[in-house]
Structures are given as structure tokens and as C-alpha cells.
Amino acid sequence: MKPVFLDFEQPIAELTNKIDELRFVQDESAVDISDEIHRLQKKSNDLTKSIFSKLTPAQISQVSRHPQRPYTLDYIEALFTDFEELHGDRHFADDYAIVGGLARFNGQSVMVVGHQKGRDTKEKIRRNFGMPRPEGYRKALRLMKTAEKFGLPVMTFIDTPGAYPGIGAEERGQSEAIGKNLYELTRLRVPVLCTVIGEGGSGGALAVALGDYVNMLQYSTYSVISPEGCASILWKTAEKAADAAQALGITADRLQKLDLVDTVIKEPLGGAHRDFGQTMKNVKAVLEKQLHEAQSIPLADLLSRRFDRIMAYGKFSEQ
């Protein structure tokens, strides 16, 4: 797959194109230019490190939405075995913006639930761009309650712009569905591990992100509203999105300082989409450790810790 570069990555894109051209020349001729290719590759890596070491919140927001980032189904394929997808909410329909089912993690049975976006236009429409309707959240809850019934740990992956705000979704009880999930997650009697892998958009993300451990990938975001939405409300123009991103504190490092996130999972150079394999290794290492810890804690203590975490939400600072 040809890499897609964001606006602020254009200097990297230019170097990458030069490297590709030189590789083509080397393949088509007897001239040895491997030293020049190596020099440009090192220059590209150094430039990438420099750019990504000082990303603004607005730029991190762009990375979190990168069209080539790994999605929930990519994590399921890489981290789990024997995945059996479960469908429907048993009330209205099957929402493809939420995927989930039974799987094995290191041989242990678990329930996996997550948002799913699409790669191409057809798939994006089918998945509703990763924005669940009420039936999606009710499906997620059905799966999590099934996990509770059989004593299976729950692992969730969060990547959504937010819950779908359409009229039909509101008529079918969007806010009730999200609220019900939040209520049930506070007392679900199994370990719950949550990982934000891309966008963590408002209540649409929170509805599957209340757990004993909450992780974020290094270049993911988590906020009550998108920077563009915030800018449109406060400044009446989306052009102020960069200012909104700064004020909202949407980045993993910022949220960890506020004790809203347990672990920030390091991403490969250039973002998770540049090296799926390394990303999966990093995520798996964290989930293995946390699952072991969660299962060693008495259930009553686990639930008490989870409740205390939720009650601590809403702190604010005037700084």
C-alpha cells in the first residue's frame, strides 16, 4: 500500500519519493547507488523524528484520523485467535460500526468489542464512518453482559468521531443507549480493558471505554468534542480548530497527566500506520500485563477501583 502523507509530512513525502526513484534506477541499471539511498533513508528517519517530536495537538488529531491507521479488525486479526463475530442487538438491527465477538487472547477466552471504520467508500458507508447508532451500543452491551455471564474478560478498542447524531438514532434512544452502557460498565463483574486506538470522540467513545484500565496509543485523541466542533461553537468557524485542540487537551500525554489514562502506548516512528507489526507488539505487551494484574485483584476491589475512577471524572483546572 502506497503511504499517505499528511500536510505537515510533505518534507518526508518528498524524500520518500526521491528514495523510490533511486531504487527504481538501481533496479533498472548496473549503477550502484545504495550508499545514496542509505543516506537519504537516514535523512528521512531523522526528519520524521524531528517532526513527530514536536507535533501540536491539532497535528496529533490528524494522525489519529489517518486513513491507513490500524482499525479494530486489524487488532483482532493480529492479537487474537479463534475470533467468532457476534451480530445484532436483539432489539432493532445489527450496527456494523461496532464489531465484537468471542476470541482467545494468549489462549484465554475473552470478549472483544470495538468501533470499526471503513477503508474504501463502500465500506465507510457500511460502517457509517465508525459512528454507532443506538443498536451498535446495545449490541456492545449485549456482548459485554454475555462475557459477564460466562466470566470472560472484556477488551474494547475505541476509534470513533462520536455517536451518530441522526434523527433516526435520536428517535431510537441514542442517549439512553450510551447512558445504559455507562451504568452497566460501572458494575460489570469481569475485568474490562479499554484502548483508544484512534479517535476517542465524546460519549460515543466513552460508551465502551469505562474500564479497569484505559490506554491510549501515543498519537490517538480523546475528547468531549472534536476540535472542529468546538471551534464552530465557540468561535463560529472551524478555522480555529487548532486553538480548540490546544484548549481541549485531547492528547494521550495530557490525559495521562490528568489521571484519565493509565498507559500511553508508544507508536512506531511516523505513527501506528507505518508499522502495523510493531504497533501490535506494543499493544499486546500492555494488555498482557494489565489482564494479569486485573485477574489477580479480588472482584470487590476491582469494582471499587473502577467506581472510584469514574467518580474522579470531571476534575478541572484553571491553569
UniProtKB/Swiss-Prot annotation:
Known catalysed reaction(s)? N(6)-carboxybiotinyl-L-lysyl-[protein] + acetyl-CoA = N(6)-biotinyl-L-lysyl-[protein] + malonyl-CoA
Its job: Component of the acetyl coenzyme A carboxylase (ACC) complex. First, biotin carboxylase catalyzes the carboxylation of biotin on its carrier protein (BCCP) and then the CO(2) group is transferred by the carboxyltransferase to acetyl-CoA to form malonyl-CoA.
Query: What sequence ranges are listed for the domain CoA carboxyltransferase C-terminal?
Result: 39-293
Query: Can you say where in the cell this protein is located?
Result: Cytoplasm
**Single Gene Ontology BP annotation:** malonyl-CoA biosynthetic process
- Molecular function terms from GO: acetyl-CoA carboxylase activity; ATP binding; carboxyl- or carbamoyltransferase activity
Q: Which NCBIfam families match?
A: accA (TIGR00513), AccA_sub (NF041504), PRK05724.1 (NF004344)
Q: What is this protein called?
A: Acetyl-coenzyme A carboxylase carboxyl transferase subunit alpha
